[in-house]
Amino acid sequence: MVKVRLARFGRKKRPFYRIVVTDSRKRRDSGWIESIGYYNPMTEPATVKMDLDRLNYWLGVGAQMSERVTKLKKIAEENNA
């Protein structure tokens, strides 16, 4: 199954996340198919940038979103509006 989820980058105690499309059997940070955005919780307010066209494409071909990505999608839609 293909999933849209967060992959952790950054350094210790300074997380930075990429929003990636990956096979659900892969590890959290490895082997992703495509990077469609990023999430930086360390900025004030938190920064979310997401390519909604690519996200909708992957959802159209059967990808599932994680709970956190679902919440971040709502924030990204508000920022783009």
UniProtKB/Swiss-Prot annotation:
It comes from the Bacteria. Keywords: Ribonucleoprotein, Ribosomal protein. Coiled coil: none annotated. Gene3D superfamilies: 3.30.1320.10. Pfam families: Ribosomal_S16. GO terms for cellular component: cytoplasm; small ribosomal subunit. NCBIfam families: S16 (TIGR00002). Belongs to the bacterial ribosomal protein bS16 family. This is Small ribosomal subunit protein bS16. It comes from Nautilia profundicola (strain ATCC BAA-1463 / DSM 18972 / AmH).
